[in-house]
């Protein structure tokens, strides 16, 4: 079947615009060519407890180093923000899904990490976890 040039170009352009994805299970997809996984957690402290949230996040990161590097990075609210940002955020980059899964298993097996989680739950009003695939440029 021979397609007119204009129709062919429309089909090619439409195909290029559709992102490809790989299914990972449980409805999760990762773009083909993803170059890593990023996990972010946001902690919105109860009033007056932002410093304690930061202390416990530091403790959890120290535990992470003892059970399975990396520790990730900790971020704090910047004074010039609009007020919607979390008081404390943590982020860690993993090479792939298997590396993140191994990290999750190490955290789950650590009594020290669970202790930090239990303590943290008493300090925040809201918690969010986000997981992203890093798309190549």
Task: State the predicted function of each range.
Residues 2-3, 7-38, 71-89, 112-137:
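Glycine-rich beta-strand-turn "strand-cap" elements at beta-sheet edges
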Residues 38-46, 50-52:
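Surface-exposed interaction/gating patches
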Residues 41, 53, 90, 100:
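Hydrophobic pocket/interface hotspot
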Residues 49-74, 108:
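Short amphipathic alpha-helical segments
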Residues 51, 96-106:
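Short amphipathic alpha-helices within nucleic acid-binding modules
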Residues 93:
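Sensory beta-strand/linker motifs that couple input domains to effectors
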């Amino acid at each position: 079947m021979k397609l007119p040039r204009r129709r062919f170009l429309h089909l090619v352009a439409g195909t290029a615009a559709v992102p490809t994805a790989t299914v990972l299970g449980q409805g999760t997809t990762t773009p083909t060519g993803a170059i890593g996984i990023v996990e972010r957690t946001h902690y919105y402290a109860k009033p007056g407890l932002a410093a304690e949230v930061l202390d416990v996040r530091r403790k959890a990161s120290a535990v992470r180093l003892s059970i399975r590097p990396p520790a990730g990075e900790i971020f704090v609210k910047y004074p010039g923000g609009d007020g919607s940002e979390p008081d404390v955020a943590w982020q860690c980059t993993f090479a792939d899904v298997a590396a993140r899964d191994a990290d999750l298993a190490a955290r789950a097996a650590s009594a020290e990490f669970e202790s930090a989680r239990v303590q943290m739950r008493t300090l925040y009003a809201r918690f969010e976890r986000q997981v992203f695939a890093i798309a190549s440029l």
